Amino acid sequence: MESAAQGRLLKPAPARSEWSKSQMGRFFERIEAEKGAHFETYRDAWQWSVDNLEDFWGEVWRETDIIAHAPYERVLASTQMPGAQWFPGALINWGEHLVRGLRSQGSKPMLIARSQTREDFSLSGDEAVDLVTRIQQGLIRAGVKQGDRVVGYLPNIPETIALFIAVTSLGAVFCSVPPEMGTRSVLDRIEQLEPSLIVALDGYSWGAKEISRVNELAAIREAIPGITAILLPYANRDAEVPAGVTAWADFTAEAGEYQVVPVPFATPLVVLFSSGTTGKPKAIVHGHGGLLVTHMRDLKLMFDIDERDRTFWFSTTGWMVWTLSVSTLMTGASMILMDGDPNWPAMDGEWSQWAMLGNNDATYFATGSAYLAASAHAGIEPGKKWDLSKVREIQCSGSPLAADVAVWVYDQVNADLHLCPASGGTDICSGFLSGASLAGVHAGEMEVPMLGVALDSWSPEGSTVPIGEPGELVCTKPLPSMPLFFWGDNDGERYKASYFDVYPGIWRHGDWLIHTERDTWIISGRSDATLNRGGVRLGTAEFYGVLDPLAGLADSMVLHFEDPAGGMGQLVLLAVAKAGADADALEKTIKTTIRTELSPRHVPDFIVWTPSVPRTATGKRLEIPLKRVVQFTREGKVIDPSVMDRGVLVHPDDVDGVIAAVIAVLP
């Protein structure tokens, strides 16, 4: 794999004369004509969007043809954070816009389902709407009312998407928990909500593994008395339906007309959950209007998706990316849905994400940066094995994308595509930073703040840090998709403490952000996971940037245990060796690489060999939870299981051994 300098230009920004080729370009050409503004670059357009926040979001509403059952009084009635008031007076419904998108495509395949558990199939736009109406009839018979919470304990399949649309169109609140989560992880989330109904599957396959969820459903019903349960026979079409549970076929037996309940802009739509690193997962409530206008901006303007696209978002149903992916249907684009292990039977096998793209004529691909890095470091050449010429854009997130991996994408996937490393969060169910059709692509960097995002990098004193220095990622003006509230946080104190405790009235996200001299951006790690060695701050991304490419190293994680007296502390590197690698030789290579490419200060005090490191299914390293568990264990404290939610981990059985190995080396 070719090495690459940070910031190397991989694709230039389009000429001003080419702006009309994208939805974003045409949007700003209209703004120029109607408002007398002038834009030469994306930076100009972004600056206008944050300087004229009400105008911008009002124009997004107009451009994307939001269906309003009552008009809004003004765009932004209060700019206070938290508590900004967006589009007061408007009556809308998120689900109605997805149904409009589905109906507009009629007989075109819109939900193209690929599964390791059952046979493949597709639903046309009309068929998907029919399923939505059948689910609505079942919900109504079950007594689900506006404001009730409905849970989907389901994978990324058409039924889950139809359930999401049906529930929210009726004004009820949806919550998704992925089937890889066990009973405790599910209950830690949904018990907070007191849901009235759950739709669950009987089981599923993950590669060669067959996993039952029958006992989990029974335990959930026992823990939440009175909940209505629906069983979807997924692993076994003839699965026995327990007493007191309704079969999916009976639940969806009656067809009906599509029903929509218009609701105020700030009405709860969906509950997403934090990763649970500081107690039970935060139940983050997002509203109909916030996700509607934000996802319209994302999908149409930032990602340039329209009815000609066939999109593939690889995501578990527990990740915010899945919620964003479902909104794709608003654009008339179709979705390729995959449920299964993308590394089975091999990283470049028939179930790989690359195979999903090539075999299904995908044009837009959203995945984890970790997946791209793993493919690159494994020497995979997807562009040679599959026809990926139709892939016009790759969006990647979850962790920083290294410069050499970005170069690999252009060399081995498609030289003409647009690569868009992005960063956002469950907290806003969208992004702060991304690529854009009007911007270029630089290796190892994120191109631009998203439109309408007043992004900055701040010092502890609350001022913009100099170019090239890390600061706290802040958002200085409100966004429509900031959470309405946290469920159960009646006084709002937990919400305020999560984002507004450092800079009152200013959103602090918790990432270290660097603004480069190229006007691009780098996230160097979580600010609460930063390593402070003798007063020098080190971002974890700096380590992974030099370690991930090492030939014999399969994975790694860096932990720093501070010295209360202000000394250097203990720096521990968890390392996973590839099969056949010489651990002693690899340890020397690791230390030499870190010493020469970073600095002697970065060299770990201990290298601990482990079978895996704690990662979520989306590839996110869980440094902070692991560090807390180690600290609590050493101090003899009782550890709440929610400190590290094993239900979200790829290798939960390895965790106890990893914890013990770290404790063993610490003095």
Regions found by a protein language model. Name each.
Residues L301, R392-T520, S527-T530:
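Conserved AMP-binding/adenylate-forming
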Residues R43-W48, G95, L111-I165, G182-L187, ...:
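Conserved AMP-binding/adenylate-forming core of the ANL superfamily
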Residues S107-P109, L231, P242-F273, K280, ...:
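Conserved pre-ATP/AMP-binding loop-to-beta segment of ANL
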Residues L292-R310, M320-T363, A378:
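Conserved AMP-binding/adenylation subdomain of ANL enzymes
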Residues I165, S169-D250, N360, G368-S369:
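Structural core segment of the AMP-binding/adenylate-forming
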Residues I31-H38, H97-S124, A235-A243:
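AMP-dependent adenylate-forming
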Residues M1-W19, A208-K209, E222-A223, E240-G244, ...:
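AMP-binding adenylation
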Residues P155, L197-E216, N236, D339-N343, ...:
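Adenylate-forming
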